[in-house]
């Protein structure tokens, strides 16, 4: 019974950290701060028309900016997930020094977080391009909505309102990853 309680507590910690810290917090705040202004610097400095006068299509320019954003946040999330996997595998209950069973769960959490970052990043970047002055306010409203829907999913996973949210599907993906591993 004591082993079961230790394992249940450890699993709960891993799942809660993955859901709240990775999908809800990192998944919302990284795109809000990084992808919303991917093209804003060039627009404010007045150098955007110089970049767009080069023989590269406007869509490609934005696409490469989004790919750069995804590369940076993906590497960050993967490194952070591997560090968390190492920490939780060392402090978790078990007979061996390192629990290798935690690594697939954390890699699944990283993959889910990267998908959420891609969805929010492309949404926030699009809003930032379409509404350069007021896009940040709309993105904050969307972020508050998504955060509320994420907590609604944590409290009531079967809620039909929360199924309209990216964070809901990210949290459901983490549940699937945990069940599969």
Residues covered by each model-derived region:
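Hydrophobic alpha-helical transmembrane segments
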Residues: 12-19, 51-62, 85, 142-152
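Secretory targeting signals
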Residues: 1-37, 62-134, 172, 178
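Amphipathic alpha-helical recognition patches that constitute DNA-binding helices
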Residues: 47, 122, 126, 139
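Perimembrane helix-loop junctions in membrane proteins
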Residues: 41, 45, 88, 92-96, ...
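Flexible domain-boundary/linker segments
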Residues: 56, 65-68, 73, 78, ...
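Helix-loop-helix units of permease transmembrane domains in multi-pass membrane transporters
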Residues: 37-71
């Amino acid at each position: 019974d004591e082993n079961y309680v230790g394992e249940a507590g450890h699993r709960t910690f891993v799942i809660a950290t993955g859901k709240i810290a990775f999908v809800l917090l990192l998944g919302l705040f990284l795109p809000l701060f990084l992808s919303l202004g991917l093209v804003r610097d060039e627009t404010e400095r007045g150098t955007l028309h110089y970049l767009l006068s080069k023989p590269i299509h406007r869509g490609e320019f934005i696409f490469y900016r989004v790919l750069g954003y995804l590369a940076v946040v993906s590497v960050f999330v993967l490194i952070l997930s591997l560090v968390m996997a190492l920490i939780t595998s060392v402090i978790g209950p078990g007979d061996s020094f390192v629990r290798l069973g935690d690594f697939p769960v954390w890699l699944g959490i990283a993959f889910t977080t990267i998908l959420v970052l891609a969805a929010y990043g492309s949404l926030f970047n699009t809003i930032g391009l379409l509404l350069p002055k007021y896009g940040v306010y709309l993105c904050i409203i969307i972020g508050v909505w998504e955060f509320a829907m994420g907590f609604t999913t944590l409290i009531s996973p079967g809620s039909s309102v929360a199924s309209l949210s990216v964070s809901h599907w990210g949290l459901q993906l983490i549940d699937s990853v945990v069940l599969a591993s």
